[in-house]
Amino acid sequence: MRPVHTTALIAGTLALGLSACTVSVRPNLGLQVSGSNLISGLKPDRGEGSTYAVGESVRILVGTRSAGYITLVALQSNGYASVLARNVYVQPGTTAFPRAQDGVAFTVAPPRGVQRVRAIFTRVRPSSDLVVSGTYDSSGFNTVTNAYVTSYAQEDRDVQETFFYIR
């Protein structure tokens, strides 16, 4: 049995350490992430949960551990979904989207609120294109993207999601 003063010291130290913690709350995105660990990072250029004003440019940074194909899909706060990049071949490492050769910019536009961006990675070139257009709730968005990747072996696919705010 531990002496009372040791337990009190541990509890006091723990309380002091925890008082310096910051708790960040993020939306419940409901994404079922694969366990293959092929995407090593996904975030907007200012970091996950950052804020962008309407009219500003945003880049999405995707890190991968293997060569393969990336599709980026956006889900706006009003539920409208669209494909930002489709079946783009990437080498291992970090790729910033849009790439210079894409000849486009991702310019932030209304609606204001949470903008979700989902990266879908496959080691092999997808045999079909992900068709996403229209309005989805979280469940419908998950259903569409999950159905797209299930034809690929679990070790050959990964899905991750990030978000930022539009003000």
Residue ranges and their predicted role:
Residues 1-19:
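Sec-dependent bacterial lipoprotein signal peptides
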Residues 21-65, 69-167:
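Secretory-pathway glycoprotein ectodomains that are cysteine- and/or Ser/Thr/Pro-rich
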